[in-house]
Amino acid sequence: MINEPLYFLPGENGFKGQILDDFLASGYYRMQHLIFTTNHTTLEPGKESIPVFWLRTEVKKIRENKAALAIRKKCLSFTVTCKKAEITTELEELYRLYKNHVDFSASATCWDYLHLDEFDNPYDSRMIEVRDGNCLIAAGFFDFGKNAIAGILN
């Protein structure tokens, strides 16, 4: 296949700090404990390849519009916590609900999406939890570099 993906395994220092920033700036993306880039992908095996567009957002330039402010107001009763990433039974149940409602292929578990058993996590991974009272209603994972972050699973 033309333009097959290019993968890198983690080195001794993993993909943290400036190393992650450099890969992100070059169009690389995390897949489990590897990092890869590609210019084309397919949605189904044997089907025509389509171009990939890697998007980056300068967070400092984001401005909330009226719709975003209205949504934020409706969500004031929710609690939002940012912490070191961890996969719990509660999170796996939320992922299972998500997986049952999407019409594309997804990993069997949240753990499977984010990790490989062969390596320790080479990223400085964090998570955001959103709760309605004690109930986990949303979660997102991201990796820290030195100056950049990469959203992984939301």
Each predicted region: which residue ranges?
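A conserved beta-strand-loop-helix scaffold within acyl/acetyltransferase catalytic domains
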Residues: 34-41, 63, 70-154
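Acyl-donor-binding surface of acyltransferase catalytic domains
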Residues: 1-79
